[in-house]
Structure formats: C-alpha cells, structure tokens
Amino acid sequence: MGFADTVTKAYMKDNTVFADAFNYLIYGGKAVVDPKQLQELDTTEIALPFGTQDAESKPPEEAVQKYRDVLKSAIIKQDDAAAYILLGIENQTDIHYAMPVRNIIYDALQYGKQVADIAAKHRARDGDAKGHSRGEYLSGFYKEDKLTPVITLVLHFGANEWDGPLSLHEMMAVQDPTLLHFVQDYQIHLIDPAKLSAEDLGRFSSSLREVIGYIKYSKDKERLSEFLTDNPRMLLEANAARVIKAVTNTPLEIPEGAEVIDVCKAVEEMMNESEERGELRMLVKLVRDGDLKLERAAEKARMTVEQFETVMENTPSQAV
C-alpha cells in the first residue's frame, strides 16, 4: 500500500469525516448519519459456498477473500424509525476503470458473508432445522431471514475528473439496449472533486470540505489561492493536512505530534519562500552574467557581501 493510500485510509476512518461523506451522498449534507452511531467493522470480506461452513466455523479452501478500505455499521434514526445498515468507503487516488466490477465483488462478498453467518447460527441453534423446509435446510437461510443493506461509496482523491465507467452497463462490449435490458446493472456512488461545485462543497460540514476543495483547485494556482483566502476553516487536523500533502504533492510542513495545521498559513509561507528562492537565483544569475554588481545584489538580497558570496558558491549553474 502506497503512502497516499495509507493516509487517505487513516483519514476516512475518522467517524466525523466518514459520516460527513455519507450525509453528503445520501442526505445532501443534512446531518442524519451520526458519528456516534458508527462502529468499525472487519474489512475482510469472505465469500463462502452457502451452507457449507463446517461446525468449527472454518472457511473452506475455495473461499474468496478481499479487503475493503473502510467498513462501518450505522444506525440511521429518522422520523421515529431506525435502520441498521453497513457503510463502506473505497478511497481512490487514481482512477480505477473497473470500479463497478470491483464494488460488485465487495458488496456480493458482504452479502455472502451475511448468509453464511446466518446459516451458521441456525445450525448451532436448530441443528436439523426442524420445522423448516428442505430448501431452508439446504441453503441454511430461512424464509423469514433478512440481510443488512450495504452502501459502498467511492471517494476519488484526485484533481483530474473521473472518466472511468460509473456503471456495469458502461463496461459492456454490447450496447444493444434490448440485450442490456436483461443484463443486471450496477451503479457506483462517487464523490469526485473535479465535478463538485462551490455549492456542493458547502454541503460538507467536516474538514472533508477543505480537503476536497484543495484537491479540486490544486492544479489552478489562482483558484487555489482564492479558495484558501476566502476560507476561514483551513485550520485542519493533522490527518487532513497529510492527505492534502500526499495526494497533491504540496510540501507542507507537518511537525511530529502536531494535532492541527494552519494549511492556509503553511501554503502562504511555502509560496513566499519559493518566490524568495526564485528572486535570489535571479540575483545570482545577474551577478554571474556581469549585469549586476556583487555589492548591489547583496544589498537587494538583504545580505552582507560575504553571505551572498556563500550563496553563489552553493548555487549550481544549472539552478539559475
């Protein structure tokens, strides 16, 4: 796993950020998913042939195993009703052109795991499934059993617009609508910075808004400067700053042990430092080309002549 994958995974595990992503996706930013009602789950998805798990609960050798990025259980309370669901996030720093298939596998494995778990409970409790039909006994899944719904969200941590397929049908070699009508489709849920408007960004309530906004404008210096200047919320937790640093290659200084980072100030200092280095290199070039006297260059750089001479000695010719 690369560094960017590691930091995005750590960031999205935060319940506040995780809930914010799904509140945006499902409820348009309304605070319905409560971070306090989220519980971390094992991200290992194992597909089992239904009803064949042995008495010791050991998966058979032909079991398929995959790993999600983040998976949490949630209790959604709305209008005096409560729903128990599973929420999964897949972080993508690069565009994945088979994402619909990948997500189908994750969701199918989770449903397969639920069926296997339910079947195992029935066997442990009922033994021979007395009072149930042969079909219920063979499948291990009873007529009244229900599955917990799974919603998987793809979060693109990249500045380029996602140009990969958003559905299984888009991936098919056949595009005949008559045939596709009988091919099951699967749509992915995607948050893509490049496609979000300023109004969309305003629907996020956590630092995810600043992270996604920074990524969105990271290739446009002028728009990024406007975003940073007009945003009073750029005092971010360290994990959010690490995501910005990793996925946009912004050389932010994040001191070890720091809990919050003033990203606006850090970027401003970085840009000022970059401008100062550029001006200093230009002065060195002018002196070397004979267009400016050493004493005058030192004065412009606010240095002594000796200090400027040291700078010249340590500045390679190819750097100016």
What are these regions (language model features)?
Residues 1-320:
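Elongated, amphipathic alpha-helical interaction scaffolds
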